[in-house]
Each structure stands twice: as structure tokens, then as C-alpha cells.
Regions:
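Short, flexible surface segments
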Residues: 47-50, 153, 255
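C-terminal hydrophobic helical "lid"/dimerization subdomain
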Residues: 207, 220, 237, 300-357
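Cytochrome P450 core scaffold surrounding the K-helix E-X-X-R motif
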Residues: 13-18
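Mid-domain Rossmann-like dinucleotide-binding core that forms the NAD(H)/NADP(H) cofactor-binding site
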Residues: 53, 107-108, 118-207, 211, ...
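Cysteine-cluster motifs in flexible loop/terminal segments that predominantly coordinate metals
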Residues: 11, 58-129
Length: 357
């Protein structure tokens, strides 16, 4: 199947590759958050038709392997490229070590197993693209973080990272009925966005985020925690610490609490600032984690496990993930957008590229 891309987002995961912190091949095409209109279909495609508006999950699944049949589309055994990692499971568009599949920051995207890998959108898709394009990755991923953490209505949650995924986790937690949603970051524009949806912003440049969480929870800690930063976490002085948010979460979450990790932790880093992380390793406070009886869930989001329900939340107005969009730009301005987004410049929260503009 060929999809004519009309909206494609820049993701924080793209920045790992943009900065040379992964083994992404030179000449590859970025872009795993894609929406567009079906332009051509192959003979084996029968449910999706030319002209349909679709959101394309960033996971590429087959629909019939053992993992896909269990709903684990992020870990497909058929589409995985085992030339680099022999026991690899999972594939994605324009993503390091996840197959030869080109991304959608282009005019057209080739989508294998088209019936399985496209989510048909409602009639209002064209005018509400900035809402529905979030179904390709970050809205399901933010939701997944709360699921991995085990969040239930009436519980408190602390989210480390107010980037797009962290803000989506906060949005998900609010929809799911969390009694308190705390979001840790230090960028004022992103903390303002967290506050705009009813979350409590915590500025870690003004003091220990752990202490601030404990103060807000009467010394007990949050019921649940979400890691939405990944291995390029930085302290307020600008130093990178791949283990920082993980260890802060162990301290911020209560005894017997749950932690969901969707921030990217790559298995290797060609240009690490911490030598230990060259092989994807961090110093983790396992002793305190064990002592507190906490649980951790990790891994890429199985987008198809959530995207239909989230589509319907958007369609009915219950969810409005486009609140994070700061810029809509033609595809030709992508280099400028990457420079600003990579620098975390003020006001550059989420960029939607428009190839047809």
C-alpha cells in the first residue's frame, strides 16, 4: 500500500538518530508518526480503500505471528530485521535497528500488510489531522506508560518529562481519573502546557523533584510513576545522566507502587556521554527498588492495542492531544525544525510537518 503523507511529526526518538546517538544509516528517511490518504493498494489489501484517511501506527506488524496474535504488534516476528540483531522482534518506519523501512517524512510511505497497519479515520480526519496524527505514536505511547505503571482511577501519578510523550501520559492520566498528576521538567513552556490540562508542574531546577513529590504526597510518594525521558536525561546544570530519571522514580513512587517506562533506552550508543551506556547499561538502584516492592513495566507501545479506542476519544471530543502542537511547517522546513526541536528552544514543543504544503 502507498499512503500520501499529509501530516508527519518530528518525534523525540528522531533526535537520537539526528544526533548520531544510534546506528541509523546515512541516507535513511526519518518519520514514524504519520497520517495521510491512501493512494494505492495491492491485490492482498481488501479492507482499506484508495481515498481512505488513515493513521499509520509506527509499529510494523504482520497480524499473524505469535506476538501479533497476542496483541504485541511492537514485537512482530515477521517484519523484524535479524541481520543486525539475530533474535530481533519488532519493526518500525525510519527507526534505528528496526528494519529497512523508510520513514514518512516524505511525500509517500510504503505500508506493508496494509489492512493490518492502517487505522481508518472518521470523516472529519482531513480537518482534524493534528489530533489524529497523534494516534501514530505518542498518544498511544503516553497511554501505554500509564498502563505499564498500573494507574487506576483515584490514584496519584508522577510523570518525569514534559516533552510530547510525557504530556500525552499526563493527558491520559487525567482522562483515566487520576486524583493527582505531577509532571517533572524544567522547561517553562512545557510545564505551562502540563498545567493547562490540570496537571501539577514540578520544576526540577528549583529543587529536588523527589522532595517536591514527597511533599505533595504527604511523604508517601506517588502511587504510580511514568518515565518519559529516556537515556538522554539531563540535570539542571546540563549534564547527561542516563540513570537519573529511573532512580528518581524509585525514590518518588511509594512502597508497592508501579513504574511504567516508555522513554527510549537504546541497547547501544555510538557516542555516549556516560561510558557505561555505550552498551546500554546504567547504574540502577535495584536495592531500593526491591526493598520498596515496586514493579516496572517497560518497552515500546503496541499501538494497535489502543489506537481505536483513542481515535474514538478524539472523535467524540473527550481527548484533544493537539494541545501540544506548537508548529505546522512545510516538509522543506524540516531542517530548521530539527535544529530548534533538538535545542529544546522555547516554544518548540511539537512540530507537525506538512509534505503537501
Amino acid at each position: 500500500m502507498l499512503v500520501r503523507i499529509t501530516s508527519t511529526n518530528i518525534c523525540g526518538s528522531d533526535l537520537h538518530m539526528y544526533e548520531g546517538r544510534t546506528d541509523f544509516p546515512r541516507g535513511g528517511v526519518f518519520g514514524h508518526e504519520n497520517l495521510g490518504q491512501v493512494a494505492e493498494v495491492g491485490n492482498a489489501v481488501d479492507r482499506v480503500k484508495v481515498g481512505d484517511w488513515v493513521a499509520v501506527p509506527f509499529n510494523i506488524g504482520c497480524g499473524f505471528c505469535k506476538n501479533c496474535e497476542r496483541g504485541l504488534s511492537a514485537f512482530c516476528l515477521t517484519t523484524a530485521d535479524r541481520s543486525v540483531v539475530p533474535n530481533m522482534a519488532g519493526a518500525a518506519y525510519g527507526f534505528a535497528d528496526m528494519g529497512p523501512y523508510r520513514g514518512g517524512q516524505a511525500d509517500l510511505l510504503r505500508v506493508p500488510y496494509g489492512d493490518y497497519n492502517c487505522l481508518k479515520l472518521p470523516p472529519d480526519a482531513e480537518e482534524r489531522q493534528n489530533e489524529y496524527v497523534m494516534l501514530a505514536d505518542i498518544f498511544p505511547t503516553g497511554w501505554h506508560a500509564t498502563e505499564l505503571a498500573g494507574l487506576r482511577p483515584g490514584e496519584s501519578v508522577v510523570i518525569y518529562g514534559a516533552g510530547p510523550v510525557g504530556l500525552m501520559a499526563a493527558h491520559a492520566a487525567m482522562i483515566k481519573g487520576a486524583c493527582m498528576v505531577m509532571v517533572v521538567d524544567r522547561h517553562p513552556d512545557r510545564l505551562r502546557l502540563a498545567g493547562s490540562i490540570g496537571a501539577l508542574p514540578i520544576d526540577d531546577s528549583k529543587g529536588s523533584p523527589v522532595d517536591q513529590v514527597l511533599e505533595l504526597t504527604n511523604g508517601i510518594g506517588a502511587d504510580r510513576g511514568c518515565e518519559c525521558v529516556g537515556y538522554q536525561a539531563h540535570d539542571p546544570e546540563g549534564h547527561e545522566h542516563p540513570n537519573m530519571t529511573m532512580n528518581n522514580l524509585v525514590k518518588s513512587v511509594k512502597f508497592t507502587g508501579g513504574i511504567g517506562v516508555v522513554g527510549v533506552y537504546a541497547p547501544q550508543d555510538p557516542a555516549p556521554q556516560d561510558p557505561l551506556y555505550k552498551q546500554g547499561e546504567i547504574v540502577f538502584d535495584h536495592g531500593l527498588f526491591w526493598f520498596k516492592g515496586q514493579t516496572i513495566g517497560t518497552g515500546q507501545c503496541n499501538v494497535k492495542a489502543y489506537n481505536r479506542q483513542l481515535r474514538d476519544l478524539i472523535s467524540t471530543g473527550r481527548a484533544k492531544p493537539s494541545f501540544i502542537v506548537s508548529h505546522e511547517l512545510p516538509l522543506g522546513e524540516a531542517p530548521k525544525a530539527y535544529q530548534h526541536f533538538d535545542a529544546r528552544d522555547e516554544g518548540w514543543t511539537k512540530v507537525v510537518l506538512k509534505p503537501a504544503a
